[in-house]
Amino acid sequence: QSGNGIMVTASHNPATYNGFKIILQHQVISGETLQQLIPMMRDENLHLDKPPESMGSLVEADIVSQYLDHIVDISRLEKSFKLVVDGANSVPGPIATQLFDRLGCLAFPLYCDIDGSFPNHPPNPADEKNLVDLQRHVIDQQAELGLAFDGDGDRVVVISGRGRIVWPDQLMMIFAR
């Protein structure tokens, strides 16, 4: 395991945007600390005091299977169900579909082919117009629910089996019960 990483993401923003999340020693770098890094990142003449090969190592790893194994190990579904996953042509779509399949559910993928131009709709589930296709597919597939993710999976909106939007604040009320 590593306590460090960088995720290139624009989250729920349009394709013209990009950014990243930095994790150092298991802590997300944000706020003032992140602001202090920006001038260094913009500095084309940035020189390191040490040669790059002496500063550590870079390891590229496919962490998806390990992540899915972990989630499956700690999950306890009482019953399987049918759902539609709208991935908005972003990374969470195929991962969520694999996860629910592994949990014994029947997951129908919708826009789960990764394409950063977002040809079907922007990866913003907070915008109702981006949920119309998912609502229709949930009803057509007679699914129990639908999930709409943003570009990096830190936002989700649920669609009920009747095609009704269940907003995140409503989900919190359900979870509080």
Language model regions located:
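Structural motif
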Residues: G3-I6, K21, K82, L106-F108, ...
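Gly/Ser/Thr-rich loops at beta-strand to alpha-helix junctions
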Residues: N13-P14, N89-G93, G153-D154
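Gly/Ser/Thr-enriched, mixed-charge loops and adjacent short helices
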Residues: N18-Q141
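Short, ordered loop/turn segments at secondary-structure junctions
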Residues: A10-N13, Q27, L34, C112-D113, ...
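Acidic, glycine-rich loop-and-beta core segments that form the ion-binding/anion-interacting portion
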Residues: P123-R177
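Ferredoxin-reductase
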Residues: Q1-Q25
